[in-house]
Amino acid sequence: MFRGNHPTRIDDKGRLKVPADFKREIEDKFQNQTFYVTSFNGKEARLYPMEEWERFEAKLAALPSLNPTRQKLLNVSNYYGQVVEMDGQGRVTIPGLLREAAEIKGEVAVMGFLQYLVVRNAEHLKNEIESAPFTAEDEKTLSDLGI
């Protein structure tokens, strides 16, 4: 499982050097070094190891093909999405369209979201956390869900 925040930088060519802890996890757990890089909202890049993305796709494929939410998710995830290989130096290129939309450049936060990684503009993330903090109501919601 991926967890934690590992701040880093995106280089001028849009390449992210996968933080060492995450790279080790990928090498240990997954057969290949291929990712599906996408977004569901244009504010972040989601880096799914291909095996994880394929599990997610299988669940989507099981939904009725005319389900409007399924169609919406496929539209946005395919619009931003590309299959990307991690190079020999442990770098992954974030697609240009997604980099522009999410303003992913310079300083970024690379966070573990259990099955995948999220890359966010560090300043935007900090502002979002400060403007919408985790509250007691959020804790209660999780408690009601058994967490």
Curated annotation (Swiss-Prot):
Any one biological process term the GO annotation gives: negative regulation of DNA-templated transcription initiation
Domain named SpoVT-AbrB: residues: 5-52, 81-124
Main location: cytoplasm
CDD domains: MraZ_C (cd16321), MraZ_N (cd16320)
GO molecular function: DNA-binding transcription factor activity; transcription cis-regulatory region binding
Family annotation (SUPFAM superfamilies): AbrB/MazE/MraZ-like
Location in the cell: Cytoplasm, Nucleoid
Entry GO CC: cytoplasm; nucleoid
Keywords: Cytoplasm, DNA-binding, Repeat, Transcription, Transcription regulation
InterPro entries: MraZ, MraZ_C, MraZ_dom, MraZ_N, MraZ_sf, SpoVT-AbrB_dom, SpoVT-AbrB_sf
Subunit (UniProt): Forms oligomers.
PANTHER family reported in the protein's UniProt record: TRANSCRIPTIONAL REGULATOR MRAZ
Family listed: Belongs to the MraZ family.
Protein name: Transcriptional regulator MraZ
Organism per entry: Koribacter versatilis (strain Ellin345)
